[in-house]
Amino acid sequence: SNAHFIAAYKVNGNTPTEGLGYTKPWITSTRLQCNLEKRNRYNAGLNFDFKIGPGSKIKMYNLFSALSRERDIREKRYDLERGRLRYVQTDADVRGSVLTNMLQGDHDFWNSTLSWGIGRSDSRQKTPYEHRLEYRMNAPFTVDINALSTLPPHLVSAPGNVNESDITQYYLYDGTFNTERTTEKEYSAWLDWKKSFDFGKLFNGYIKIGGKYRQKDRERLTNRNYRRLDQNAPLIYDNMPNISRSKYDNRYVGIADFMDGSFKHHTFLNNRYDNLDFSFALNQDVMKNFYNVNSNVYRPILTTKIQKDYDGYERLTAAYIMGEFNIGKYITFIPGVRYDHTYMRYGAYSGVNVPDDETQELSFDYTKTTDNNSFHYWLPQIHLKIKPLDNLDIRLAYTETLSRPDYDLLAPRTIIKSTIGEVVYNRTNLKPALSKNFDAIVSFYNPKIGLFTVGGFYKKIKNFIYTRSAYLLEGTATDPANFGLPSSLVGSGITYALNSPYDATIKGLEIDIQTQLRRLPGLLKGVVIGANITLMDSKMGYFETTKSRVKKPNYVVGDGSKPFLPINKDTVYYDRLLKQPSFLANFMLGNPTRIGGVAVSSPACCGISMRQKAALS
């Protein structure tokens, strides 16, 4: 379970607030949210290992995992803008499963090894039931709302400011029922051949070549049903004539029959604030029965399908060659290169006159849109290990890696919301992010002192993906023709994803120390202490577009045109990468002992490393 307290603010105009040098924002709403979740996880595995002759073996792995989640989400919102109290509860059943099968073999012959494998993975995520009901209480505030909007957020709901004690004043406002199914199937096959060579102690190693094919098929199907239940309460009374009615207005459905009598009061946010709490909850079984009886009242909402559904596939073909060359006992050189080719094809929906929210029961024109893209990269890697002393080694590495776009951004959609003048546009033309990585690591080991490692790293990343919102303007990068849109949409807003033209860099220093206290007496003997400290500095050019207006030259009052022209103001600012820390510290304490000849370790550690160093042999 978890709980959140959220306050929303708003600010308009540029007139400074009295006594301040700026326009002070005001509260529009405060929200209490409590999420309860019950999880059941099941796992099963079946593995086989066959030896079919000298130097040959075949292995089979089968793994099934299932997860069911029963979710209960409660939210209470103090809506200052509209002067009402809103209580929303969502009851959901989410199920997921993964089935993985893999067959692989290794065969030794002629001082070489041939490895092969085939695999299949089937991942399914479905929400067969998600029911949401919203109750409202009108005019619960007992003081001037304007005065509440400037208070500290947790004081808005103080008993002297709002009267919510009579829950019979709640009335049923609306209901939503959602289902969703997402599937992802992956098929893969790979083949590797490794040939060792040995020219004595001065020069030995191996050469390895291989290839891989991977196919991914994805699909998401959603269904949303919604209805205003205050306006359509007579339909509910036809199905449930004895259901209780609201004391606020006898025409509306009340809350009394939905109350959970077994609800147990729990402190909200550990009683951090006196005025924040949930005093009741809806009964989940009653909510399910309500939908089962009144499912004919709910109406399908097409907007959700247009904005979320997709299908598609990706085909990845890769090949590589690498080698490990040991020059004496002091130098190990590991060069390699990988060729990566990806072809993708996705389908989604595009619509015109799409409603601006998912509560309007409107029909509109839409079509299925398909788009494809392909890209290929050569990804080199070089590793060098130098060991001048038995207890000292130096490691250098250069690698290039890819990070592919989120497939939800690749689904080709053109959503035109004419009522608010907005367009949402997605296509498969996004490039993967390419990272060039440099690492240098020095390690020193002494049995009496322990292991000391210091490393430096530098990363340069291009093709970061960001979302831009701008006006559609002719003769600019957001010319409607560039998106296949009609010129009549000039002046409308558009939101689309694109690759950033600015690179990001990350550089840092990492120090790691591990030592064992061998000379301490008793249980403390052999205690292992470790510490890791990372200092990082990152820099990214962020591209921001501000939608603005300028006065139209030669404007004539009454000529039927608008007095202002829309413009896009582009700004680039540099800052550290989002969610990228500048300092990390990890500590580890281990107490290895031996019980009956079995080594037992009880580590206690904190901190999570945010960086993965290049793998060095």
Language-model features: locations:
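Transmembrane beta-strands of outer-membrane beta-barrel pores
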Residues: 2-4, 64-68, 109, 120-124, ...
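Gram-negative outer-membrane beta-barrel transporters
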Residues: 458-460, 477-610
